[in-house]
């Protein structure tokens, strides 16, 4: 592939990412951010969404992943925690706390990408918890068991974000309250890691 084609493809990817982020920020419902709306906003051929990202959902996930990555890079407190001497279990708690808080604060993104994440998660995708779980068990569980725990724990938390209003009304657990959210995460992590 020539350098010109690579630059054009990268420019197309960036236009799609930036336009999608803008549309997601401005919309009241994620369903408003259609492939056609994204293509129109970015000035890019509709087929390029599938070519660059595999699907609209893949594009939405990339936008969300970039948002999460930007928050993690610029949140000095989070960076300090992740590089501290905290136990893997404590770091896992902080990771899930940050992730769930971000997902609740950006609920439109969460609604749009959670199903995609749940159905496409694999060893390279959506398994940010795995290293902390492996380190926590330190050989007491095999890698397959650790992957299963990472999958189950992350899936529970992602589904909890989607249903946070129902959890509040049915169980009187307000996941928008930081203290309650931290408690909820600790309860779930303890179930899987103890």
Locations of regions flagged by a protein language model:
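N-terminal intrinsically disordered/low-complexity leader segments
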Residues: 1-11
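Short, leucine-enriched amphipathic alpha-helices that occur as contiguous helical runs
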Residues: 9, 13-21
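Helix-turn-helix
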Residues: 15, 23-58, 62
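Short, basic, alpha-helical segments at the C-terminal edge of helix-turn-helix-like DNA-binding modules
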Residues: 35, 65-72, 78
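Amphipathic alpha-helical packing segments from all-alpha helical-bundle domains
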Residues: 72-76, 114-148, 183
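Hydrophobic alpha-helical connector segments
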Residues: 76-109, 143, 150
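Amphipathic C-terminal alpha-helical segment
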Residues: 101, 112-115, 150-173, 191-194
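C-terminal peripheral helix-coil segments that are non-catalytic and often amphipathic
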Residues: 134-143, 162-194
């Amino acid at each position: 592939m020539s350098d010109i084609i690579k630059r054009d493809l990268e420019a197309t990817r960036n236009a799609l990412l930036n336009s999608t982020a803008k549309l997601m920020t401005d919309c009241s419902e994620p369903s408003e951010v259609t492939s056609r709306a994204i293509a129109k906003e970015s000035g890019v051929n509709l087929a390029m969404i599938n070519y660059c990202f595999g699907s609209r959902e893949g594009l939405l996930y990339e936008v969300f992943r970039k948002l999460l990555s930007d928050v993690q890079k610029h949140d000095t407190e989070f960076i300090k925690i992740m590089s501290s001497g905290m136990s893997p279990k404590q770091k896992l708690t902080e990771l899930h706390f940050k992730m769930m808080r971000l997902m609740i604060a950006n609920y439109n993104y969460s609604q749009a990408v959670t199903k995609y994440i749940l159905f496409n998660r694999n060893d390279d995708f959506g398994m940010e918890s795995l290293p902390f779980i492996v380190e926590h068990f330190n050989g007491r569980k095999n890698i397959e068991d650790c992957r299963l725990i990472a999958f189950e724990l992350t899936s529970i938390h992602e589904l909890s974000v989607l249903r946070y209003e129902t959890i509040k009304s049915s169980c009187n657990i307000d996941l928008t309250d930081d203290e309650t959210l931290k408690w909820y995460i600790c309860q779930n992590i303890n179930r899987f890691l103890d």
